Amino acid sequence: MTLYQPESGYSYNSDSLFLYDFISRFNPKGELLDVGAGCGIVGLLLGRDFKTVNVYGVEKQEHFIKYAQKNAQVNEIKYKLFQSNFLELEEQKKYDFIVSNPPFYPEGVQKSEDAVLLNARYASNLPLDDFFKKVSRLLKPHSHFIFCYDPTAFSDICTAINRVKMRICDVQFVHSKENKNASLVMIHARNGSKSMMKVLNPLIVMSENEYTQKIKEIFLKTDTQSIKCQL
């Protein structure tokens, strides 16, 4: 998949590819909304590989809108994009899947002065409670919410998810190496579920200075090529 990205500033990284792989295990279908779509990478990969899914994206930064539209066009994927702050998105339409790689840099991390980076990275732009409340209002009954986040916020995530009557069903932590602390957590939650939480085997990125076999498989499956340009 060819993906156009801005020449400078925020670019997608491997977190989005890992999230795509995690979402894939739940066989997405029906109406799917990608929150904070950026250049469209997560939603477009799902639209490419799951033919029974109708992909929508919401992105508030005009800077990214034209890249997401261009990427949908060149990859010939049907993709409807809303330019909106997610918290202000109209609620008439309901979704079977909501997925997101949201901003999650915590308070206390030195903030960029670049407005695009500021909006794309920092959790203060999409607080957990507000985020989850909005998701709960946009999901159909017994639907799926799948996202990644800073693993140090896992306790806060569990508390906030419970407040909106959703249940975490599956969790996978990502580690750069086997002996390193987790750098990412990927979470599958549902509304109306009574399932016990499953903690999946961790996703290990590197082993002895090379990518693990699983990571190589993810990169091969996603098959993305990035083109930095100015649109």
Q: Which ranges hold each PLM region?
A:
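Residue-level signal for inorganic ion chemistry
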Residues: 19, 101, 131, 189
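Glycine-rich, phosphate-binding/catalytic loops in enzymes
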Residues: 20, 114-117, 163-164
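Conserved Class I SAM-dependent methyltransferase catalytic core
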Residues: 3-4, 8, 12, 126-182
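Mobile active-site "lid"/loop adjacent to the S-adenosyl-L-methionine
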Residues: 103-130
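SAM-dependent Rossmann-like transferase core, predominantly class I methyltransferases
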Residues: 1-31, 37-39, 44, 48, ...
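SAM/dcSAM-binding transferase cores
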Residues: 181-231
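Conserved SAM/SAH cofactor-binding pocket of Class I
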Residues: 21-91, 97-111
